């Protein structure tokens, strides 16, 4: 297992490259109760030249770590109803991820009500106090949320949840306006969400982002097949 990189070192590594999100949830075709599928996707991503992996769950991350030294952005998806945030939503999930020695922990930093009752700035501060050497990424949906996380000391701001909160911009593709605005504000942006084509990734890279995460367009074959099938119907 490689040593955790500094923010500067990681930014060098991610610059101009693609981070591939390798995830499958129960009910999806590539989900397996016994595991073993996500490391195959990660291996394919590495062979293609990916600069990092985003992965969900302790099991999947451990399996991916066994086959690659690429930096991992780790999350744990767990529902806490009736609250909506479910991506690394409490300190419990942060603790589990911190024990894995991964490069970055990503967590929901939207303004929605949280299970722990904290506001985002307080949650970020608590995590930073507990794990001062851990790089952190805020999954947000709006410019204001990104700015709050940035000002609270988060290392990276991901546009992951734009279009997935009721109050954020609803678009079929990536939220280019949000990505550009955060970059112009001096935020280290990891663009993520609805990036469907190499052309979109190139446009995003030209905005000066710190990194780009592509998931469904690479690692969700059902979604990819549906896009082709729908195109023939239109």
UniProtKB/Swiss-Prot annotation:
Q: In which pathway does it act?
A: Amino-sugar metabolism; N-acetylneuraminate degradation; D-fructose 6-phosphate from N-acetylneuraminate: step 3/5
What cellular component terms from Gene Ontology apply here?
cytosol
Instruction: Recite the UniProt keywords alphabetically.
Output: Carbohydrate metabolism, Isomerase
**Isomerase: present as a keyword of the record?**
yes
Q: Name one GO molecular function term.
A: N-acylglucosamine-6-phosphate 2-epimerase activity
Annotated InterPro entries: Aldolase_TIM (IPR013785), NanE (IPR007260), RibuloseP-bd_barrel (IPR011060)
The cysteines joined by S-S bonds are none
> What is the catalytic activity of this protein?
an N-acyl-D-glucosamine 6-phosphate = an N-acyl-D-mannosamine 6-phosphate
Coiled-coil blocks: none
Q: Name the Enzyme Commission number(s) assigned to this protein.
A: 5.1.3.9
Top-level enzyme category: isomerase
Q: Fetch the Gene3D superfamilies from UniProt.
A: Aldolase class I (3.20.20.70)
SUPFAM superfamilies attached here?
A: Ribulose-phoshate binding barrel
Q: Which is a GO BP term held by this UniProt record?
A: N-acetylneuraminate catabolic process
> Among its keywords, does the record have Methyltransferase?
no
Per the similarity annotation, which family is this?
A: Belongs to the NanE family.
What function is annotated for this protein? Converts N-acetylmannosamine-6-phosphate (ManNAc-6-P) to N-acetylglucosamine-6-phosphate (GlcNAc-6-P).
- Please report the name of this protein according to its UniProt entry: Putative N-acetylmannosamine-6-phosphate 2-epimerase
What gene, per UniProt, encodes this protein? nanE
């Amino acid at each position: 297992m490689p040593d955790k990189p500094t923010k500067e070192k990681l930014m060098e590594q991610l610059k101009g490259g693609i981070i591939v999100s390798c995830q499958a949830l129960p009910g999806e075709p590539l989900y397996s109760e016994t595991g073993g599928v996500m490391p195959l996707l990660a291996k394919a991503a590495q062979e293609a030249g990916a600069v990092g992996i985003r992965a969900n769950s302790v099991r999947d991350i451990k399996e991916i770590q066994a086959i690659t030294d690429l930096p991992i952005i780790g999350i744990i998806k767990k529902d806490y109803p009736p609250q909506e945030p479910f991506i690394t939503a409490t300190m419990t999930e942060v603790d589990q991820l911190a024990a894995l020695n991964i490069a970055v922990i990503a967590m929901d930093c939207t303004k929605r009500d949280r299970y722990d009752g904290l506001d985002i700035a307080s949650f970020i501060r608590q995590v930073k106090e507990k794990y001062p050497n851990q790089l952190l990424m805020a999954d947000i949906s709006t410019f204001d949320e990104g700015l709050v996380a940035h000002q609270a000391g988060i290392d990276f701001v991901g546009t992951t949840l734009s279009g997935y909160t009721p109050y954020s911009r609803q678009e079929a593709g990536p939220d280019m306006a949000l990505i550009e605005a955060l970059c112009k504000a001096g935020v280290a942006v990891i663009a993520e969400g609805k990036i469907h084509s190499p052309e979109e990734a190139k446009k995003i890279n030209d905005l000066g982002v710190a990194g780009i995460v592509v998931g469904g367009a690479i690692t969700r074959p059902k979604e990819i097949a549906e896009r082709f099938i729908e195109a023939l119907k239109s």
